[in-house]
Amino acid sequence: MSDFIQSYNNDPFLGNLSTPVSTSTFTKGLLNNLPAYRRGLSPLLRGLEIGMAHGYFLVGPFDKLGPLRNTDVALLSGFLSAVGLIIILTVCLSMYGNVSFDKDDAKDLLQTTEGWGQFTAGFLVGAVGGSGFAYLLLANIPVLQNLGLS
């Protein structure tokens, strides 16, 4: 078993282990295709793609598990709750960018105040759009609304 698990780059001081799963080409390819690590994406498009995914999956838990889950307005309240959480997350992302990045000479555009602002704007637009898309799907396709918890 010790032949399979080694220190990452043979450096035991990194605190990371190199396993057959974490260093496989499949895992590296999968992680490199995520918008956080994909090369060539502007911060705005990166935030848009991450926001769409987050907005899309936030509506369901608020709809099915929220306090108004057994009422006629459960879906609408789930959508509005998701948008409220998205606004809170956007404010937190904005605050993080303002206090973390003070130099504009970083080699990665996302590591600057302006780049992080673009990421945050893209996240807001994408997340609200993703929640709206999920709301429209659930409101107009009854089969989807009846799936899951009742």
From Swiss-Prot:
The places in or outside the cell where this protein is found are: Plastid, Chloroplast thylakoid membrane
Superkingdom: Eukaryota
Q: Which GO terms describe its cellular component?
A: chloroplast thylakoid membrane; photosystem I reaction center
Q: Which residues lie on this side of the membrane: Stromal?
A: 1-72, 140-150
Name of a matching Pfam family: PsaL
* UniProt-listed GO biological process terms: photosynthesis
Show which residues sit on the Lumenal side of the membrane.
94-118
* Protein's name in the database: Photosystem I reaction center subunit XI
Q: What is the lineage of its organism?
A: Eukaryota, Rhodophyta, Florideophyceae, Rhodymeniophycidae, Gracilariales
